[in-house]
């Protein structure tokens, strides 16, 4: 729930209290029939992972599944609790008590989308130290660049992460001891993928859009993308800003995938978030490269199996919009599925 200033951050956390991101009271009684993508139990949709034990860690306090503050923060006569580290650790303890994952699990995929992507990366080393099986990480839509918004003249996400740390991390560091050591006085940096990925010891797979419309709006102040996911309404200055940001994401993904065992799937398509758990998982409209047959599902499976040829699981689009044509002018129906 981080925002550009501390007051806005508190307000955002407060607003989350009455949503499923802030309280289990608003969660459905069952997720049966609600899960898609890599979480689906349908073998036709999820042929390689549908028979796995799938556990969902719902969000609680808006601090990326980490941080701890013993005393609540009072805001608008309401107590806000920031205890993501203890909550996540207790979930791991519960999994071990119920499934004996510390000794029985041979393969574990720790995956997350958006803030959950950073949460998965932060906890990966800790989880691997606790279990005998092999831990792998999938980070979906978690690559946000530390840049200055030209409209506000402020680095939005840097400000937001500093505020999160002020609220939740005065008493503890992040779950990633290696990143804490790397940035002892600026631990907020560990909430950025660009600073975190190299400290993760496990094999990781990164899923992201090279044209993340929400990032453009928040980081760049660009709000020209139309309802069909095109840049047709953007002027030359806006397109140049978008392409500059996209180049930064490409460079970062290329660095991350240069590490042995790491993979990626990043199309030159305009979309946003949760690509692992939406119809985009197997949708042939979304392939990287275009018409290559490499959907997210196929690329992730090749990475998981450890195929020898990296070109089968390292797919960062080399073109710009709209040159991955099938996903550059999607229909209204497809668009509604992508943004649900």
Question: Where are these predicted regions, by residue range?
Answer:
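C-terminal His-loop and adjacent cap/lid subdomain of alpha/beta-hydrolase
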Residues: 1-340
């Amino acid at each position: 729930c981080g925002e550009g200033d501390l007051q806005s951050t508190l307000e955002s956390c407060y607003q989350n209290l009455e949503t499923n991101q802030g309280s289990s009271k608003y969660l459905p009684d069952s997720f049966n029939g609600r899960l898609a993508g890599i979480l689906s139990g349908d073998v036709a949709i999820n042929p390689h992972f549908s028979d796995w034990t799938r556990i969902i860690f719902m969000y609680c306090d808006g601090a990326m599944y980490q941080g701890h503050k013993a005393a609540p923060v009072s805001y608008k006569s309401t107590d806000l609790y920031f205890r993501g580290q203890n909550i996540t650790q207790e979930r791991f303890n519960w999994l071990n008590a119920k499934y004996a994952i510390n000794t029985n699990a041979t393969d574990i995929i720790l995956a997350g989308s958006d803030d959950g992507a950073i949460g998965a990366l932060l906890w990966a080393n800790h989880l691997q130290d606790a279990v005998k099986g092999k831990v792998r990480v999938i980070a979906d839509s978690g690559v946000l660049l530390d840049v200055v918004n030209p409209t506000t003249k402020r680095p939005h996400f840097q400000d937001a992460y500093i505020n999160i740390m002020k609220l939740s991390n005065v008493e503890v560091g992040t779950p990633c001891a290696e990143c804490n050591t790397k940035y002892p006085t600026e631990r907020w940096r560990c909430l950025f993928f660009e600073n975190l990925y190299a400290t993760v010891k496990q094999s990781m797979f990164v899923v992201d859009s090279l044209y993340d419309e929400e990032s453009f709006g928040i980081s760049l102040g660009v709000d020209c993308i139309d309802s069909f996911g095109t840049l047709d309404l953007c002027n030359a200055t806006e397109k140049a800003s978008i392409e500059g940001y996209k180049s930064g994401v490409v460079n970062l993904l290329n660095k991350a995938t240069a590490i042995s065992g790491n993979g990626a799937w990043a199309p030159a398509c305009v979309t946003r978030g949760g690509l692992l758990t939406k119809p985009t998982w197997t949708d042939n409209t979304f392939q990287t490269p275009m018409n290559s047959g490499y959907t997210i599902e196929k690329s992730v499976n090749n990475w998981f199996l450890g195929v020898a040829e990296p070109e089968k699981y390292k797919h960062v689009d080399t073109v710009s919009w709209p040159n991955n044509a099938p996903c550059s002018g999607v229909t209204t129906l497809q668009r509604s599925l992508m943004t649900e």
